[in-house]
Regions:
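Eukaryote-specific, cytoplasm-facing alpha-helical/coiled-coil scaffolding segments in long proteins
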Residues: 150-151
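Long, charge-rich alpha-helical interaction segments
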Residues: 154-191
């Protein structure tokens, strides 16, 4: 959702207070609070990388509130012309950030600079783990690592500003990170590599589920979950899950 938030800040030139970081668990509460705050003057509500429930949609429609949804989770498909649920785009997996970017560009809220295209593509490859090359995997891992270091709010503000710089031709494609960030990312990845490599067939429990050889990994720190899974399956292809 951070990529979508950066696009909202940049594309709509809006204030941070108008962008909310929601999960399926707190979405209804946030929408309810904004409906109470704005009354009959609630502006168009945009949902990206998260889909409102049928109950939320019913409340918005009852109040006559305009809304749009940009999501790539097929399980969230709901009957409404305002909802764009796409798992694929141009023949490959897509994500909420890419769907939102396409709409913003088509409606002239932003122009698709090379920097913007690279930023969105890195997020897409990471979000759906669709890596076309080792280089693509590395770029995605670096951006995700910076996200972990900065946290969602700082990451969003930093890249909303960089998108603005790129729009003014003050930042080029490939200039995703500054020198300090590159050093911080490198140090963090070194530390993460030690954790990831510590998981081997000898250190995990193995069970068979519906004919699939499955590794049960206990990660007490709760970090790098996707990377541990991805690296483990790549190193030990005899496992299915």
């Amino acid at each position: 959702g951070a990529g979508c938030a950066a696009l909202f800040l940049f594309g709509f030139n809006t204030k941070e207070e108008n962008v909310f970081f929601c999960t399926p668990y707190n979405l209804a509460k946030v929408v309810e609070e904004q409906m109470c705050k704005w009354g009959d003057n609630l502006p168009t509500v945009y949902f990206a990388d998260v889909c409102p429930t049928a109950d939320i949609i019913a409340k918005l429609e009852e109040r006559g509130v305009e809304f749009m949804v940009f999501d790539h989770h097929a399980t969230n498909t709901l009957p409404s012309s305002n909802i764009t649920i796409e798992e694929t785009l141009d023949g490959r997996k897509t994500c909420g950030t890419e769907l939102l970017c396409r709409w913003l560009a088509a409606n002239k809220f932003l122009k698709e600079t090379e920097f913007l295209q690279e930023f969105v593509e890195i997020i897409r490859t990471r979000d759906v783990f669709d890596f076309s090359s080792p280089e693509a995997r590395e770029r995605a891992l670096k951006l995700f690592t910076l996200f972990g270091l900065y946290g969602i709010r700082r990451f969003t503000k930093v890249f909303a500003f960089r998108l603005l710089e790129a729009d003014a031709e003050e930042r080029s494609a490939g200039d995703i990170f500054n020198i300090t960030e590159t050093l911080l990312i490198s140090a963090k990845l070194e530390k993460d590599a030690e954790l990831i490599s510590s998981f081997t067939p000898k250190s995990v429990s193995t069970v068979t589920v519906d004919g699939h050889k499955t590794a049960l990994i206990l990660n007490s720190k709760g970090q790098n979950i996707s990377d541990i899974s991805d690296a483990f399956l790549a190193a030990y292809p005899e496992y299915d899950i």
